[in-house]
């Protein structure tokens, strides 16, 4: 059984715990952290499918900067901003950086779950395209493999 992994990043501890518990209740593997820095550390250790990310987090890096760094660590992770402070500027900047969507807090699970399902599908589609592309760039020759992407021979 495939377990989808969701990381919730929010400085409001009560909100964070509530969302994580509700996601786990629905069979998702959910993790919660209170800062952008903690999220980046977790992403270095654990593969995540979707990140629910607050934009305004005091005392450290904000959601926009966290998103910039997320895309360097796990470029295929889908990011949905969950925020009470969405502005047109932050929405545009987030979308340019690769955010999948924005939801305004308080968010209802009836609204969040379809967005998560769509984000999982999108991530899976991206992964399948990459796998397909990598397979298509390999040519098998007796005794060796030639990788068209790197233009070099690889031993079996």
PLM feature spans:
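C-terminal output helix
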Residues: 107-117
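Active-site residues of response regulator receiver
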Residues: 10, 54-55, 83
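Short amphipathic alpha-helix used as the core "switch/output" element in two-component signaling
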Residues: 41, 61-75
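Short hydrophobic/Thr-rich beta-strand motif most characteristic of the beta2 strand and flanking loop
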Residues: 27-35, 42
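CheY-like receiver
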Residues: 122-156
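Active-site beta3 strand of CheY-like receiver
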Residues: 46-52, 57
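Conserved acidic segment of CheY-like receiver
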Residues: 3-14, 19-23, 51
């Amino acid at each position: 059984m495939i377990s989808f992994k969701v990381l919730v990043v929010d400085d409001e501890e009560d909100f964070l715990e509530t969302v994580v518990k509700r996601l786990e209740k629905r069979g998702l593997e959910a993790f919660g952290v209170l800062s952008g820095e903690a999220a980046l550390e977790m992403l270095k250790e654990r593969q995540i499918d979707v990140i629910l990310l607050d934009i305004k987090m005091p005392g450290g890096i904000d959601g926009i900067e966290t998103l910039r760094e997320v895309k360097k660590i796990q470029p295929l992770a889908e990011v949905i901003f969950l925020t009470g402070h969405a502005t047109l500027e932050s929405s545009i900047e987030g979308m340019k950086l690769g955010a999948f969507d924005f939801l305004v807090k308080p968010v209802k699970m009836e609204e969040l779950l379809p967005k998560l399902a769509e984000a999982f599908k999108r991530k899976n589609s991206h992964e399948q395209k990459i796998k397909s592309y990598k397979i298509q760039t390999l040519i098998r020759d007796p005794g060796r493999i030639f990788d068209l992407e790197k233009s070099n021979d690889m031993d079996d």
